[in-house]
Amino acid sequence: MNFKIETTPRFEKDVKKLCKRFPKLKEDLIQLITELKNDPTMGTHLGNNIYKIRLQNSSISSGKSGGFRIISYYFVGDTLYLVTMYSKSDRETILDNELKKIIQQEINER
């Protein structure tokens, strides 16, 4: 499969903030990107080409359930966008209407 993985400004801001608290996050993300190159639709399908990916936090021993959530948007064609990221210890979930608004701001208005 030949496609690009791009990050949104919001995702980059989220990662920068989380890296201050979780020093192994960059290593975890490198591993995830390698996996995404083989399967861009990995994770839980939320509809409309939006996926929620569970990522284990290697900085703490909590497994995937207490790790990170990454929202990705697979633009049919050749681009996978990493839209936003949050820690389960900070936020339980993200609402559908909030997610649609974020995707519109971060991707559709480019």
Give a label for each model feature.
Residues K20-P23, K37, T41, D90:
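Residues in soluble alpha-helical coiled-coils and helical-bundle/repeat scaffolds
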Residues T41-M85:
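Basic/aromatic recognition patch in beta-strand/loop cores that engages polyanionic ligands
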Residues F68-R110:
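Enriched for short, Lys/Arg-rich terminal
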Residues K24, D28, T44-L46, Q56-I60, ...:
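Short, structured surface patches at the beginning of a domain
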Residues M1-Q31:
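Arg/Lys-rich, positively charged N-terminal/basic patches that mediate binding to nucleic acids
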